[in-house]
Amino acid sequence: MSSPAPSGTQVQPGSLRPCPGAVSPVVPRRLARGRLESSFSVEAILARPKTRELAATSLPLSTCTSLNLLGAVSQYGVLPWVCSTGSWLPAYLSVGVYPLCSMSCVPGLNVTHHQQGLRLTGSELPYCLGPLKWAPTVDLRDHGTERHTKRVRTTFNLQQLQELEKVFAKQHNLVGKERAQLAARLHLTENQVRIWFQNRRVKYQKQQKLKLPSSSVMEEPSSSSDGNIQSEDAELGIGS
């Protein structure tokens, strides 16, 4: 261990080395004329230690784990996990950027967590050597009520309606091959034809209830195939 230099001894420029792990402030040298050298002169700027060389080493995985850098999750999700070489930062912020962990970045971590855990100043924005990953957006909508998909109502043209009404006047229910042939002739699907006949039967029954007296309200409409209406409605259900 070297003894401290006696008072009056002049310190030669370049004899002091920066402490490892920290950047010592540049001490302005005293010129021969008795005035202090400016810290913004060319000599003072060149004499400063290179920040990038000191920032080449990163903390090991055990240190990152002990500081809870890998498991911390951003509460507010305001800023993404900063993952770049600091080139995107302004000049006055990119000077004091130091790497904290050499592992891949974890989305959801922001600068506030690192400043609280490592007691860093505002200009020392920590970053990680890894690809840029933005924090996932948080959907603030209420997920308690799920929206049901609205059924699209089929629009029939005049020719299709006339043909459907003509067939319904003869037969109130179509099944199997007859329904498939009618759907192909009208350029519709079998499901569209089935739903139209179900709705038309409901409308027909309401009309019959208004016409008939109260004693015959529960009577079914007379048709050759009306006996199969209830069985089909029970299996498929009445749609709208």
Curated annotation (Swiss-Prot):
It is found in: Nucleus. Residues 213-225 have a biased composition (Low complexity). It holds the Pfam family Homeodomain. Residues 1-21, 208-240 are annotated as: Disordered. GO terms for biological process: determination of left/right symmetry; dorsal/ventral pattern formation; embryonic pattern specification; heart looping; motile cilium assembly; notochord development; regulation of cilium assembly. Keywords: Developmental protein, Disease variant, DNA-binding, Homeobox, Nucleus, Transcription, Transcription regulation. Its main location: nucleus. It comes from the Eukaryota. Residues 149-208 bind DNA. The keyword Chaperone does not apply. GO terms for molecular function: sequence-specific double-stranded DNA binding. Residues 1-13 have a biased composition (Polar residues). The keyword Ligase does not apply. InterPro entries: EMX-VAX-Noto_Homeobox_TFs (IPR050877), HD (IPR001356), Homeodomain-like_sf (IPR009057). It is linked to Defects in Noto are the cause of the truncate (tc) phenotype. Truncate (tc) is a recessive mutation that affects the development of the caudal notochord. Mice homozygous for tc are viable but viability is reduced, which is attributed at least in part to spinal injury in the sacral and lower lumbar region. PANTHER family: HOMEOBOX PROTEIN EMX-RELATED (PTHR24339), HOMEOBOX PROTEIN NOTOCHORD (PTHR24339:SF68). Transcription factor that controls node morphogenesis. Acts downstream of both FOXA2 and Brachyury (T) during notochord development. Is essential for cilia formation in the posterior notochord (PNC) and for left-right patterning; acts upstream of FOXJ1 and RFX3 in this process and is required for the expression of various components important for axonemal assembly and function. Plays a role in regulating axial versus paraxial cell fate. Activates the transcription of ciliary proteins C11orf97 homolog, FAM183B and SPACA9 in the embryonic ventral node. This is Homeobox protein notochord. It comes from Mus musculus. The gene is Noto.
